[in-house]
């Protein structure tokens, strides 16, 4: 496949991916149709670079990365260290216990912590907890 840039890549993507992207919320035409730089080559701190090398200040700051910025050196170092150790098994890693303890220490109202792999799983868990606590089957949800 020929390498495409920006809007041309996005237009092509829309022919093979419904909506042009794999996430429901990140469609370029929602922001600036035909001009929005839909794809980025790299990101560091609060900046992103498009496929042509143009640098932008990311005013959206993504979801979650706004706390530390993109490509945080300390985070990258820790992630790479753990990837090299082998990070994909069916077994549990001890770090989840240490992280759970930190979460509980920061939230005195919590006596336990549970982690999920993504938003959908977190929502499903929240709904189960709501049903258990309220003894009601229906749960109002907006989002």
Where do the protein language model's features map onto the residues?
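Short, hydrophobic/aliphatic alpha-helical segments
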Residues: 4-12, 48-54, 104-105
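N-proximal short alpha-helices
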Residues: 18-22, 48-49, 72, 76, ...
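Active-site-adjacent loop/helix segments that line or gate small-molecule/cofactor pockets in enzymes
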Residues: 2-42
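Short amphipathic alpha-helical surface micro-motifs
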Residues: 5-7, 28-30, 50, 95-97, ...
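Active-site and channel-lining beta-strand-loop segments
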Residues: 37-58
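Short active-site-proximal "capping" loops at secondary-structure junctions
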Residues: 30, 45, 64-66
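Glycine-rich loop-to-alpha-helix module at the N-terminal edge of alpha/beta enzyme cores
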Residues: 55-138
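Substrate-binding/gating loop at the entrance of the active-site cleft, primarily
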Residues: 142-143
């Amino acid at each position: 496949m020929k390498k495409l840039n920006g809007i041309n890549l996005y237009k092509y993507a829309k022919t093979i991916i419904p909506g042009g992207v794999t996430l429901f919320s990140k469609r370029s035409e929602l922001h600036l149709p035909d001009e929005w730089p839909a794809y980025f080559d790299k990101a560091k701190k609060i900046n992103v670079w498009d496929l042509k090398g143009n640098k932008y200040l990311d005013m959206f700051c993504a979801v979650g990365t706004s706390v530390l910025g993109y490509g945080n050196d300390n985070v990258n170092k820790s992630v790479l260290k753990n990837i090299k150790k082998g990070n994909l098994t069916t077994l549990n890693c001890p770090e989840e216990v240490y992280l759970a303890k930190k979460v509980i220490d920061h939230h005195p109202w919590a006596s336990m912590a549970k982690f999920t792999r993504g938003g959908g799983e977190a929502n499903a868990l929240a709904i189960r907890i709501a049903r258990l606590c309220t003894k009601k089957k229906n749960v109002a949800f907006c989002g």
